[in-house]
Curated annotation (Swiss-Prot):
<dbReference type="InterPro" id="IPR045849">
    <property type="entry name" value="IP5P_plant"/>
</dbReference>
<dbReference type="Pfam" id="PF22669">
    <property type="entry name" value="Exo_endo_phos2"/>
</dbReference>
<dbReference type="GO" id="GO:0048766">
    <property type="term" value="P:root hair initiation"/>
</dbReference>
<dbReference type="GO" id="GO:0048765">
    <property type="term" value="P:root hair cell differentiation"/>
</dbReference>
<dbReference type="GO" id="GO:0004445">
    <property type="term" value="F:inositol-polyphosphate 5-phosphatase activity"/>
</dbReference>
<dbReference type="InterPro" id="IPR000300">
    <property type="entry name" value="IPPc"/>
</dbReference>
<keyword id="KW-0378">Hydrolase</keyword>
<protein>
    <recommendedName>
        <fullName>Type I inositol polyphosphate 5-phosphatase 5</fullName>
        <ecNumber>3.1.3.-</ecNumber>
    </recommendedName>
</protein>
<feature type="region of interest" description="Catalytic 2">
    <location>
        <begin position="451"/>
        <end position="466"/>
    </location>
</feature>
<comment type="function">
    <text>May be involved in the regulation of root hairs development. Required for restricting both the size of the root-hair initiation site and the width of the root hairs during the transition to tip growth, but is not required for normal subsequent tip growth.</text>
</comment>
<dbReference type="GO" id="GO:0010053">
    <property type="term" value="P:root epidermal cell differentiation"/>
</dbReference>
<feature type="region of interest" description="Catalytic 1">
    <location>
        <begin position="371"/>
        <end position="386"/>
    </location>
</feature>
<dbReference type="GO" id="GO:0046856">
    <property type="term" value="P:phosphatidylinositol dephosphorylation"/>
</dbReference>
<dbReference type="GO" id="GO:0009932">
    <property type="term" value="P:cell tip growth"/>
</dbReference>
<dbReference type="InterPro" id="IPR036691">
    <property type="entry name" value="Endo/exonu/phosph_ase_sf"/>
</dbReference>
<comment type="similarity">
    <text>Belongs to the inositol polyphosphate 5-phosphatase family.</text>
</comment>
Amino acid sequence: MNNRGNNDDLDHHYGVFNDFERRMTSRKKSVLDNTSPMIWKTVSERKSSPGIEGLNLSSFDRPMAPTTEIRELRVFLATWNVGGRTPNNDLNLEDFLLVEGTADLYICGFQEIVPLSAGNVLVVEDNEPAAKWLALISQALNKPKQESVYSNAAYSASRTTTCSSSSCGSEESRAPSSLSFFQRPNLKVLSRNYRVDSSLLKTCNCPVIDTSVGWEARRSKRFSDPSTDSSNNVEPENFRVHENFLFDDVPATTKMPGQMSYRLIASKQMVGLFLSVWARRELIPHISHLRLDSVGRGIMGRLGNKGCIAISMSLHQTSFCFVCSHLASGEKEGDELRRNADVAEILKHTQFPKLTKNPNCHAPERIIDHDRVLWLGDLNYRVALTYEETRVLLEDNDWDTLLERDQLNMERGAGRVFSGFQEGQIFFAPTYKYSQNSDAYAGEMTKSKKKRRTPAWCDRILWKGEGIEQLSYIRGESRFSDHRPVCAIFAVEVDVKSLNKGRFRKGYSCAAVRLVEDVAIPQRHSFYD
């Protein structure tokens, strides 16, 4: 009897418990039915729901993906056919380089720095004029600001005293500005002195990303033994360059001569063509992928008396290509087609060396594949009018009519050359051909038709790509050559990658959200900006 009574008590208690459980379950169901689905879904359900994937808390331990911001730089370009003349110590390039309006990059292209004689074209390349141009450019860019632009005394003193902008202290003996123009300058030695320490330039700074490996595995690999990680030591393949081009091996401890504000990034000569790229010192750590190529289009369509030099590089995450060219000459009908052919062959045959096997390396191998292309030079396009017709329009300052007959404008408008390139509006007089040391065009002083040339805008600067705005397009007035120099300043956008170190994904708090079965109360989920 006692056992039966105990069983009845147990049955009674189980019945009460089951009734209580049913009522609690009913209450919880009622609450959950009126609650946002974001609260009552299980963790597994939340993971599988693409609509609320942001609540996957396992992603909070990883940093945000790198973002890209846009910055604007000033880029100065200049082109000058110097007619085979070698500069002397009286030539001041400060006005030519517009140094008072300091740019971030300076790209200086010259044509005919040596006479285009058979000896220079076929035998030995004369490097002395190129060395002198480098010395003059460096002196203009790195001259102390307190010196007057027009002070000849200051100009002479800067080359003879012991405290010039590029020679101070122990570096004086090797500083380029101490070079006497009566000595025989050595381009290799000068370019080594002007160039930045090679340890500051990365051949390739693109990250190596293995998409077949998960994020956790990549993170573990990053913090593994650094001696086993070769991603930061990628060696270029087939990376051979001219001795004048890239940085010679300089000890990492070597100081910059005189702490120059601008350093030579690259330079190259091909017979009379000479191109150099200079950068503000602060930008040097962000320059990479530096490569060079040249294409000869002169005698037999191959030699270097005509053609181009091209320099490719990346600044931050943006690729640049600078092209300096000297195209086929002549003002006879049909000569413009030869110039068109030169441009086509340059675009076809310019091929920059491949740097690395890294598939994520953004180092274009062709000119048109770059983000920003800046093309300068003596393009040699003429005005499709007679000398007499051109002279009348010049005397009337009717440049609009002249520019309508400009061969480059006509050929570009017809889509036969420089497809996709742009040129700023021209507000200056034709740059070729002038009499020696004169402001008069050749032909005004003589009756000989052989020496007469129809004035033309031979010297031009064009560009291709997004994020480029031309701020100025002018010519210089130096009488040094039968060409007037042409300069342009651009505002150029570059992509800068931000790594977001120490930051996490925005949108949700890192607090775990759990639904406890015994407490069916809606939880508040926090957000922050």
